[in-house]
């Protein structure tokens, strides 16, 4: 089969044999690709350092039966240098990479929107000009939008009655009107759903002006909504929570939301 080229974000890697690695890539035109990078663990490898997680690359690959083979790599953006040396950026970036892999769908299914979103998010994390908690929640909301899971924020998730509505229920799909409100719905403080809308829409002025209590509440809702749809917890999110020192009430509320909506689902 013919070689092909594609732009990719390196999501993760693991050892194979004495000198090789298997890398998981989120490519622009071929979606999720798993490939063998031969000899990259040797000190004389030409492109081993370019295949670290967080790297944005132009790769040439040879199609294989189960795994493709990386034959050439050109670095486009070296985000890792600015991310891995800062624990907060690192845990935030890891949560983004794990989410990207989980939402990419079947291997080789084109994912240009998710690829573009992930590159932009990693660039923002590496730049460090915006709060990492807001960047992560914005990424998760927009990634869910690409997957078709974004919560309803401006209308009722069940009957589409225009909002704003105060109640929120994950299994119902987001905000719900008084007539559709299921048992067990939560009522976020005023401004929380507005903050979620601002993050989804890219209104950074409004998002960065929100109080920390609202930001913490949003993080809980966003994580619970995503993990309800994934039907399992992201391994990296607890690390992010520890970095931001989420208070006990936020952690308990997040666990309650996930548990409650798993039963409803």
UniProtKB/Swiss-Prot annotation:
Gene3D superfamilies: Nucleic acid-binding proteins, Recombination protein O, C-terminal domain. GO terms for biological process: DNA recombination; double-strand break repair. Keywords: DNA damage, DNA recombination, DNA repair. The keyword DNA damage applies. Transmembrane segments: none annotated. GO terms for cellular component: bacterial nucleoid. InterPro entries: ARFGAP/RecO, DNA_rep/recomb_RecO_N, NA-bd_OB-fold, RecO, RecO_C. Belongs to the RecO family. Involved in DNA repair and RecF pathway recombination. This is DNA repair protein RecO. It comes from Mycobacterium ulcerans (strain Agy99).
């Amino acid at each position: 089969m013919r070689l092909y080229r594609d732009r990719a974000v390196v999501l993760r890697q693991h050892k194979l044999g004495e000198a090789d690695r298997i890398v998981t890539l989120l490519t622009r035109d071929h979606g999720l690709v798993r490939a063998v990078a031969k000899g990259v663990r040797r000190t004389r490898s030409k492109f081993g350092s370019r295949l670290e997680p967080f790297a944005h690359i132009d790769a040439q690959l040879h199609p294989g039966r189960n795994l493709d083979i990386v034959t050439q790599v050109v670095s486009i953006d070296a985000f890792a240098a600015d991310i891995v040396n800062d624990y907060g950026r690192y845990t935030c970036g890891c949560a983004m990479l794990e989410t990207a892999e989980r939402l990419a769908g079947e291997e080789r299914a084109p994912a240009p929107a998710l690829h573009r979103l992930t590159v932009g998010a990693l660039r923002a994390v590496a730049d460090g000009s915006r709060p990492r908690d807001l960047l992560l929640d914005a990424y998760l909301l927009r990634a869910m939008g690409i997957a078709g899971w974004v919560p309803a924020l401006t209308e009722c998730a069940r009957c589409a009655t225009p909002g704003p509505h105060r109640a929120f229920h994950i299994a119902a799909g987001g905000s719900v009107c008084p007539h559709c409100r299921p048992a067990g719905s939560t009522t976020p403080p005023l401004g929380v759903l507005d903050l979620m809308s601002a993050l989804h829409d890219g209104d950074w002025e409004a998002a960065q002006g929100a109080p920390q209590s609202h930001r913490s509440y949003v993080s809980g809702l966003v994580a619970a909504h995503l993990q309800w749809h994934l039907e399992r917890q992201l391994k990296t999110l607890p690390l992010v929570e520890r970095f931001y020192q989420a208070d006990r009430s936020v952690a308990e509320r997040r666990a309650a939301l996930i548990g409650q909506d798993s039963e409803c689902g």
